[in-house]
Structure formats: structure tokens, C-alpha cells
């Protein structure tokens, strides 16, 4: 792709990375020739409008081929498939200008900073097109001209059913809206003349999914679906609702005509129809959308494009905005590392130490502050009596454990002595270290409120059943004792809610190591930005 140098005015040339771009496509089978350069010019949203020529009215793209809306499916799927390499870019193929012949403008919910054409047009045509057809254009917009090569006529699968209905329905989790979701939602919109209903699963249906704790909140997922549908086809009604079973409103809504499913969930469509028949309703026409393969699946990721894979790819990355803490100095940069029992904290801490961090294990610090002569030692003896002191003069941790774990008030007394002593010792070690990055590993980081001493919180999580098995094997515990220990800690979801970065140590050590290495590399980039 090259920037127009003679036809486009200096004011219209790209000056910076655009937030949102609109790509006018006349040759949809070959947009892959343009995308690599285009994605360097835009960082958030890419709208795509099919249009044979700038002078053509919207709704007239290859009319001899696309004489009914659903026939666009194959071409639109091909467009999305060509964008799979650029998963950080939110690509949206607009439908209004394809479905309706009376649409005058290309409407988008986001203002357009950059307009891209897949072939060269005269300057006057470009200027007139932008002024008259794109109402959401910004004042400081830029223009790029690309070359998608020789035109290849789109094709349509003659064996498919292309009927259109009043009311379509589909359901799913819709976590981290991705290309496969967009294909399903697009199919539902192309099939509907009046209304699309989307059921979005609530939390009680998510437990079996990989890294389900990282699934976006229901409200976010519902809003994501609404936003997409309102962008690509605002003319129809969008009814996006939570569902707590596999049927949702499809089981008893007589106005629905067609259900859109993936090839993986086709059986679900059959079950919905079985339920409708029990309710005395007509079965829905089932339209199946093929799964789309991920171009670069890694071990432990699914071959298909999926939300599970996208969640896995967030591991080691910032998942929650980092809030600056005015009371903390820029150096050292302190990471609070926490997580449940047997979740892999220590392994992550050791790897961070290998990479250059100063690693402080607060559990070992706790042992240190219990030692005779330390401030915590004297206070513990004063509070709990000499009976907690062993024959060797040291605190008998089992003895004091038997006291405090039966009585929350006694536990609170112990914590009020030990926790401040640990923090004081940790801070003293940090002062002496002169380190750039400190990792403060503590299972009780959140419960003790120590996250206030950290620039970021990193958490390790593991499925509860795996943690249970690891704990039994490591500590030689009975099933009941292991369950009791796990029940006493906060759950994975709370760790994730508090964390800026998350690790998942379910798989082999090398996979966890890669997560940590990625997190370290990104951390150094953040610190560099802070210091410049």
C-alpha cells in the first residue's frame, strides 16, 4: 500500500496512527494484499464497506450474484478469514449498504480517522465520496490508496439455502468477541428482516470452560454483542438477553423462525426444536455456520478460532489497567505475586528471579520474624503464653496454629503481630537490595492488604480439582483435609479480579515459563515508558 502523493492534499495525508479506519472494498477476495500495510496505520477498529465503484449506490455490489442477502455469507466469511492474522484489530463488515438499496450514507458508531480504498480513484471522486457518503468522518481524516490487484469475481455456493426470515436467534458465551462470533452474528443479521435475538450465557453455565474465571462479565459480553450488531446493521431490532440454560427464549417464542448455530453446536439447535415441539411451537430452520481455524494455534490452544484461545493468549499480559500509586516511588518497581495453594507461585517467582528480579518469599520472611530475638517473637510469647514456645526456644508453629485456627479472634491477634513485622522486614530488604524490580511473593498479599505496597499485582491460578490433587500429593493429606485447606482460601475469581497479570500453571513447566517470560518483557517495556 502507498500513500496518494499527487491527488491527495497535504492536509489529508496520514500524520499519525488512526484509531478507526474505513476500507472501501471493490475486490473482496484480495484484501489480504492490503491488510499488512493497513494494520500499521490503524490500531483499533477497521470498518469494511463493499462497493463496486465510488459512483455506485450502496446496495448494488455485484447485484447479479448477490440477489438475496444471505448470499453475501461466503464473501464476508472470506473477508474475515483474511483478517485472522490481525486479531488485535476489531474488523467489522458493514451490512446496511449491502442489504438495503435506499441507504445513502455509510454509518458507523465510531468516527472515521482514515479512509482506505483498495484501488485508485480520481481525486474529485474521492473528495466527493467522503463528503457526501461518510457522515462520521473526522475533521483531520487521512486517506490511503491501495492496490488489491486484478478483480476476482465473488462466488456463491449454489447448494446452500438462502431463505430470509423475519426473526433469527442464536446463543453463546460471546466472550472477547472474535471472528467466529462475528460470522455467527453476521449470518443472523443477513437472515433477518426485522429482528435478531441473541442469548448470552450467565456465569452458572461457564464452569466447564478453560480459564472461565477470565471470561468477561455478563454485562460486558451483552454490550459487546449489541455494539457489533448496531454497527453492522442498525436497521433491525437487536434483542440481546442473558440465558441460564441452552434453550433461552428460543424454546417458547412463537415469533422466531430460524436459529443460527456453528457446526460444533448444531446438536443444540436440534434440542431447541425438540423443546419447541413439546411447547406446541413450529421448529426453527437451522442454519449452520462452519467453524473457522486459527492460523497460528499453539500447544494447549484449540485449532478453531475460540474464546478459550483468546483467554489463553492473555496470560502474561496486562488484563486490568494499572492504577498509579502516588505513595510509591518509581524505583524499585514492586510486583506483588500471589495465588492459591499449589497454583505455581514459587515457580513463577523463581523464574522472575532468573530473569533479573529481586525475589522475596514472604513465607520465608514469616519464619524469620518468628525467630527468637525478633520483635514478633516477643509479642507472640506475650500474647499467647510460653506454652507456644518449644523446647528449643523457638515458636512452635503447630502449637500456635492449633490455637488460632480454631478461633478467628486469636487468628486476628496473631496476624496483627506478624503481618506488620513481615512488611517491615520486606521493606528493609528492598532498601538494602538497590534492585530495579522486586517481586514480593505472598499467598496472603490480598488478605493482608499488602497490594497497596505494590505497583502491580500478578496472580497464579489453577483449576480447583488440580490444586486439590497437587496438595494431596505434596503434603500427603487426606481428601477431606486438602479440601478444608482449599476452602479456607479465596477463590480464583477473586485473585483474577485483583490482578493486573495472570498466569496459569496447568500445563508443562515450559508453557508457564513462556507466560512469565512474556510478562517480564512487557513489564520492562512499561517501566521504560515510565522512566522516559
Language model segments and positions:
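Walker A (P-loop) phosphate-binding motif
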Residues: 168, 325-364
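Residue-level signal for inorganic ion chemistry
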Residues: 178, 259, 363, 414, ...
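ATP-dependent small-molecule kinase phosphotransfer cores
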Residues: 364-435
Amino acid at each position: 500500500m502507498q500513500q496518494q502523493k499527487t491527488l491527495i492534499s497535504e492536509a489529508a495525508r496520514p500524520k499519525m496512527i488512526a484509531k478507526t479506519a474505513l476500507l472501501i472494498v471493490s475486490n473482496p477476495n484480495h484484501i489480504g494484499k492490503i491488510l499488512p500495510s493497513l494494520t500499521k496505520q490503524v490500531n483499533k477498529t477497521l470498518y469494511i464497506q463493499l462497493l463496486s465503484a465510488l459512483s455506485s449506490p450502496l446496495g448494488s455490489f455485484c447485484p447479479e450474484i448477490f440477489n438475496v442477502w444471505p448470499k453475501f455469507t461466503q464473501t464476508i466469511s472470506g473477508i474475515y478469514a483474511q483478517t485472522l492474522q490481525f486479531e488485535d484489530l476489531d474488523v467489522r463488515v458493514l451490512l446496511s449498504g449491502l442489504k438495503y438499496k435506499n441507504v445513502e450514507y455509510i454509518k458507523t458508531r465510531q468516527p472515521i480517522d482514515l479512509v482506505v480504498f483498495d484501488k485508485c480513484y480520481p481525486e474529485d471522486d474521492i473528495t466527493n465520496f467522503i463528503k457526501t457518503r461518510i457522515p462520521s468522518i473526522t475533521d483531520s481524516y487521512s486517506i490511503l490508496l491501495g492496490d488489491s490487484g486484478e478483480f476476482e469475481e465473488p462466488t456463491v455456493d449454489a447448494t446452500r439455502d438462502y431463505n430470509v426470515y423475519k426473526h433469527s436467534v442464536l446463543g453463546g458465551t460471546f466472550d472477547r468477541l472474535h471472528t467466529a462470533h462475528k460470522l455467527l452474528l453476521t449470518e443472523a443479521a443477513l437472515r433477518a428482516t426485522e429482528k435478531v435475538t441473541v442469548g448470552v450465557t450467565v456465569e452458572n453455565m461457564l464452569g466447564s470452560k478453560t480459564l472461565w474465571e477470565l471470561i468477561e462479565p455478563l454485562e460486558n459480553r451483552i454490550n459487546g454483542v449489541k455494539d457489533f450488531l448496531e454497527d453492522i446493521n442498525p436497521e433491525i431490532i437487536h434483542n440481546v438477553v442473558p440465558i441460564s440454560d441452552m434453550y433461552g427464549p428460543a424454546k417458547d417464542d412463537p415469533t422466531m423462525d430460524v436459529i443460527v448455530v456453528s457446526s460444533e453446536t448444531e446438536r443444540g439447535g436440534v434440542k431447541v426444536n425438540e423443546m419447541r415441539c413439546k411447547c406446541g411451537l413450529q421448529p426453527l430452520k437451522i442454519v449452520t455456520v462452519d467453524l473457522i481455524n486459527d492460523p497460528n494455534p499453539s500447544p494447549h490452544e484449540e485449532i478453531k478460532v475460540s474464546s478459550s484461545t483468546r483467554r489463553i493468549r492473555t496470560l502474561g499480559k496486562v488484563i486490568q489497567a494499572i492504577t498509579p500509586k502516588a505513595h510509591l516511588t518509581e524505583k524499585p518497581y514492586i510486583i506483588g505475586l500471589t495465588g492459591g495453594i499449589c497454583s505455581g507461585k514459587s515457580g513463577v517467582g523463581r523464574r522472575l528471579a532468573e530473569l533479573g528480579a529481586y525475589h522475596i518469599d514472604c513465607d520465608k520472611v514469616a519464619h524469620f520474624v518468628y525467630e527468637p530475638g525478633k520483635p514478633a517473637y516477643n509479642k507472640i510469647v506475650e500474647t499467647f503464653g510460653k506454652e507456644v514456645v518449644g523446647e528449643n526456644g523457638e515458636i512452635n508453629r503447630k502449637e500456635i496454629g492449633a490455637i488460632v485456627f480454631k478461633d478467628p479472634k486469636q487468628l486476628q491477634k496473631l496476624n496483627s503481630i506478624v503481618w506488620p513485622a513481615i512488611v517491615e522486614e520486606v521493606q528493609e530488604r528492598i532498601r538494602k537490595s538497590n534492585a530495579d524490580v522486586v517481586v514480593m511473593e505472598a499467598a496472603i498479599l490480598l488478605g493482608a492488604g499488602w497490594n497497596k505496597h505494590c505497583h502491580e499485582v500478578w496472580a497464579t491460578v489453577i483449576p480447583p480439582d488440580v490444586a486439590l490433587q497437587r496438595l494431596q500429593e505434596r503434603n500427603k493429606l487426606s481428601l477431606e483435609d486438602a479440601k478444608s485447606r482449599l476452602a479456607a482460601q479465596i477463590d480464583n475469581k477473586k485473585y483474577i479480579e485483583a490482578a493486573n497479570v495472570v498466569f496459569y500453571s496447568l500445563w508443562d513447566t515450559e508453557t508457564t515459563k513462556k507466560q512469565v517470560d512474556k510478562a517480564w518483557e512487557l513489564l520492562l517495556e512499561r517501566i521504560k515508558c515510565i522512566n522516559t
